[in-house]
């Protein structure tokens, strides 16, 4: 089993769960309705020319540019409405596609989360089994290491006082009690 961390479905930077950036969306919208930015640019240009005319004191040119600004804004609105009517079915399809993509992303995220939970559960079970085996081996080793009662004839010639577990006072008492 590899020691790499399990990829989380909650990672925001995961490219698997990203769809369209803001710039991509802007360029797509610009391609869908190219007349709207053109109308906005014409409006800005008319306002700029009206400002320059006002600074120079030419009121006739300024009024003409303000009228041009109104025409440019009307053009922008007409382009927006016409584009909305023209791309209505395409936008509806796009909306359905976006909903399907969102549903797919949610399902993928849920599936990734479930896989992650299954992997973590499997690791947890393996860890418990390993530790249960280690504990069983330790108990078995503890049972083997426990001293067995040997018959008196099989005892070694070591005096009870010579055993390491008995202290000096206990050894003296044992010698006195024997006599």
From Swiss-Prot:
Topology with respect to the bilayer: Multi-pass membrane protein
The UniProt record lists the keyword Mitochondrion: yes
One GO biological process term: mitochondrial respirasome assembly
Subcellular location as annotated: Mitochondrion membrane
Family: Belongs to the RCF1 family.
Assembly with partners or alone: Associates with the respiratory chain complex III/complex IV supercomplex.
Protein name, entry field: Respiratory supercomplex factor 1, mitochondrial
